[in-house]
């Protein structure tokens, strides 16, 4: 597995083909540029709402996709839903916008920026832990994944950011970098 073995990269033919397909699709998208501003806005909105919905759903948020859209784009409150669920949707959307600003301005993702994103996601929900490493062990119900012990987190985050920089320097395919980041975080 790429992220945990660091220097060992397993590149199967199937993976090479999938990465080539990604490159082909990206080239087709680039060829369509510049996309009309209205089309870009619609794509951006649809992505942000669906990503917010799916991320929060995994964490137990009960807002539907349509309710998530109303909360983040229209500022509507949904009867019978908790303030926490509303804040989770709003904060996630804010975090997406924050990350997009990083990409536009070519700002390096660091431990500090990851903590800032974490603080945005937990804003108004969990002040004590927002933007900080956790200090207690946790379990994820229904998952076989065992999160690291609190005393290991800082070291693992340092390793994560170091490895991410190495992968960028080595010109590792962006899809593999994204997979590493998703799997590791």
Task: List PLM regions with ranges.
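FIC/Doc superfamily catalytic core
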Residues: 1-185
